[in-house]
Design a protein with these regions (language model features):
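Short, contiguous alpha-helical
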Residues: 31-34, 40, 44-47, 52-96, ...
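Short glycine/proline- and charge-enriched loop/turn segments
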Residues: 24, 95-99
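Bacterial Sec-dependent N-terminal signal peptides
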Residues: 1-22
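Acidic/histidine-rich alpha-helical segments that form the ligand environment
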Residues: 99-131, 138-141
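An acidic intrinsically disordered interaction segment
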Residues: 33-40, 110-116
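Short flexible/disordered coil segments
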Residues: 24, 114-128, 146-156
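Short N-terminal segments immediately surrounding and downstream of signal-peptide cleavage
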Residues: 19-35
Length: 171
């Protein structure tokens, strides 16, 4: 009987550790793409200190930093609304619109709102139940990958314009 109880306790502890580690991994991914130093430069670091003029700068056919940040904000805001069960604004489904709606005058607001939305997703994950996490883990992991991808693009654009400080993490 003691062995059975011992095995049940181990199984229970193992299941709890797996559930909490999924939350921990998702939070680590979200925070490393948002504002924590990890394997790569975070989004907050990638956009910090950039003027609205530099945010609107484009080289050839590439997107500007502002367009990339606006695109990230657009999709993260929709994910957060989904997670919270909120109604989303209508959207045509044309991904190009998520880049094209950036306006240089709104740069500082985009940066602030992006920080708030990313924090909102992190808070949602922190407070989510196991069932909520299970249902949304793939979406959250993909958001992190999406944000990391576009953060890399932001750094490439900043390097091209000469506004990137290599001391921030990428030479």
């Amino acid at each position: 009987m003691k062995r059975i109880l011992f095995l049940l306790a181990i199984i229970s502890i193992s299941a709890t550790a797996q559930k909490s580690s999924m939350k921990a991994v998702l939070l680590e991914q979200l925070k490393s793409t948002h504002n924590a130093s990890n394997w790569f430069v975070s989004l907050n670091v990638a956009v910090e200190g950039l003027s609205s003029e530099k945010a609107a700068w484009k080289d050839g056919g590439n997107h500007s930093v502002g367009q990339l940040a606006y695109h990230i904000l657009f999709w993260n805001e929709r994910v957060l609304q989904d997670l919270k069960g909120e109604k989303k604004a209508s959207f045509s489904g044309k991904n190009d619109e998520t880049f094209e709606n950036f306006d240089q005058a709104q740069w500082n607001d985009v940066v602030k709102k992006l920080d708030l939305v990313l924090t909102g997703i992190e808070n949602w994950v922190e407070n989510a139940t196991d069932d909520q996490l299970k249902k949304n883990a793939s979406t959250i992991a993909n958001v992190s990958a999406h944000n990391a991808y576009h953060t890399g693009q932001i750094i490439v654009v900043r390097k091209a314009q000469g506004s990137w400080d290599p001391e921030k993490g990428v030479k």
